[in-house]
Amino acid sequence: VGFKAGVKEYKLTYYTPEYETKDTDILAAFRVTPQPGVPPEEAGAAVAAESSTGTWTTVWTDGLTSLDRYKGRCYNIEPVLGETDQYICYVAYPLDLFEEGSVTNMFTSIVGNVFGFKALRALRLEDLRIPPAYIKTFQGPPHGIQVERDELNKYGRPLLGCTIKPKLGLSAKNYGRACYECLRGGLDFTKDDENVNSQPFMRWRDRFLFCAEAIYKAQAETGEIKGHYLNATAGTCEEMIKRAVFARELGVPIVMHDYLTGGFTANTSLAHYCRDNGLLLHIHRAMHAVIDRQKNHGMHFRVLAKALRLSGGDHIHSGTVVGKLEGERDITLGFVDLLRDDFIEKDRSRGIYFTQDWVSLPGVIPVASGGIHVWHMPALTEIFGDDSVLQFGGGTLGHPWGNAPGAVANRVALEACVQARNEGRDLAAEGNEIIREPSKWSPELAAACEVWKEIKFEFKAVDTLD
């Protein structure tokens, strides 16, 4: 066969509306905004080509392989309601394009160079369908929801956490003291802020030692298992693992990683270490809004959440719906289910473009954190249910009487909400009353209620459903 050089329209090769997707294909839903004058078929085909086998011109070496076997295919295009010149393009990728067990490689292909492509004004990856054949090449979360509950011996309620503030500037001893007071007051976990690594004012080893002391002291006094998310994130993978090893030697239950700034390769390495050594892994999503906040460009957080479940983590921050950070209720609950459940049906009203079967990969506990306080407790209990961690940083440490009373207030409020729910009361309608009742006999809760009675963060979410 003679080789025909030259530039060929992508849609002639990569737009295949008749294609029947296979169970082993990775499916992607892209929100595509083409440049003026570029037809949607060409734009969708360009995305499929540039994120799989294609390049800008035909090449002689195409003849040495089977494009039909390896190319990505744009198999469906839908206009976006209410937007002119914006489309959802569905692309199917053959499984052979991806290295097994590598989120890094999957993203390098699917969301690599194609996002800088000139023929597109903007491009956003809305959702991915990961086939069971690919999921089975990943370890996934180190332990998962059930194992964590069994290790902590805590059932039937959300877990409570608190990020230690001020996030930067405390000495290790004062930091440990703040942890102890929160845990002693009734929280299950305290947390390193995501920016706390190993700075001049507090080196990591000192922090780990004082936090471990706080955990053991609080456990002895309360009879409950406690934890502190020790942030193992570091400048190199080797240093990160070194910190995780030290945490294990101290006998603490959980470490933490910033998975986007640290990178998926580092995260997967740490997740493997955590499973092999019985450590839980808390994941913070610092940098996610750089990628996911704009509605027409980047990548939706539900994709980052799916990627994390593959890479490995037992907790991940997922927005609050009611606090200070971005997140619409239906969308947030959509990816919360994607994190926790084993099987999720396609549901466009919640932004879920594909049915996803996780084939028994362990679940991840969503963490609600950011601008929440005792008055939010009924809403949080209703929205997130039992398998969640509710984190009150300022909502604990900002208590007028100090950290321990702040922790007491949160624990009393949570227990009241769980009891009310179990009695069949309507948390949404009776929320304020449910919080007021226990504040009659809990002075700590009464003081917290007084401080935060008027605080609200009411702005419309930027990233909404169409």
Swiss-Prot record:
Modified residues (N6-carboxylysine): K191
PROSITE patterns tied to this protein: RUBISCO_LARGE
Residues with site note (Transition state stabilizer): K324
GO molecular function: magnesium ion binding; monooxygenase activity; ribulose-bisphosphate carboxylase activity
Subcellular locations according to the entry: Plastid, Chloroplast
Gene Ontology annotations of biological process type: photorespiration; reductive pentose-phosphate cycle
Residue numbers carrying N6,N6,N6-trimethyllysine: K4
Main location: plastid
Reactions accelerated catalytically: 2 (2R)-3-phosphoglycerate + 2 H(+) = D-ribulose 1,5-bisphosphate + CO2 + H2O; D-ribulose 1,5-bisphosphate + O2 = 2-phosphoglycolate + (2R)-3-phosphoglycerate + 2 H(+)
Keywords recorded for this protein, A-Z: Calvin cycle, Carbon dioxide fixation, Chloroplast, Disulfide bond, Lyase, Magnesium, Metal-binding, Methylation, Monooxygenase, Oxidoreductase, Photorespiration, Photosynthesis, Plastid
UniProt PTM comment: The disulfide bond which can form in the large chain dimeric partners within the hexadecamer appears to be associated with oxidative stress and protein turnover.
Cofactor binding comment, as recorded: Binds 1 Mg(2+) ion per subunit.
Binding site for substrate: N113, T163, K167, R285, H317, S369
Sequence positions that bind Mg(2+): K191, D193, E194
GO cellular component, one term: chloroplast
Catalytic site: K165 (proton acceptor), H284 (proton acceptor)
Function: RuBisCO catalyzes two reactions: the carboxylation of D-ribulose 1,5-bisphosphate, the primary event in carbon dioxide fixation, as well as the oxidative fragmentation of the pentose substrate in the photorespiration process. Both reactions occur simultaneously and in competition at the same active site.
NCBIfam families: PRK04208.1
Assembly and binders: Heterohexadecamer of 8 large chains and 8 small chains; disulfide-linked. The disulfide link is formed within the large subunit homodimers.
Protein name, entry field: Ribulose bisphosphate carboxylase large chain
